[in-house]
Amino acid sequence: MTIGWGGIGTLWGRTALTVYVAEKRYTKEFMDKAEYFTVMTFDVKDSKVLNYMGTKSGRDDDRSATQGDACPDKKAQALGLHTAYTANGTPYYTEAAMVIECKIMYAAPFDPQYFKSDAPKRMYANFPAGIHSMYIGEVVNAWKK
């Protein structure tokens, strides 16, 4: 997945990675069904990959890293990306500079009644993708090229 919001730290005695996915994003459908997820980094020289992944929805362009080889992603293949799977069955691109695999420990949407500032209220008032859900994953594997 391509994320703009996230963090890494320690929670419940575990190394944890937190990601946020808006309710109308295609990725959310997969996150809600998944037991594991991967987050990848790419070299700066691969900015075309990041731009593509951050702007093209899997709804419109079947990205194989979310759907497996049954739905090949022609654009990702044209970018030179190849899908592989972890021992847990979680997809990732072999060209990633770093892959972090997480097991989901917690998932819930933000509840507006708990917003303590006007910043999220203002943002969501004009945000067509809907409110975000927070996913906290225990880091179970990490690979670096």
PLM ranges: what are they?
Residues 1-145:
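Active-site-proximal mixed secondary-structure blocks
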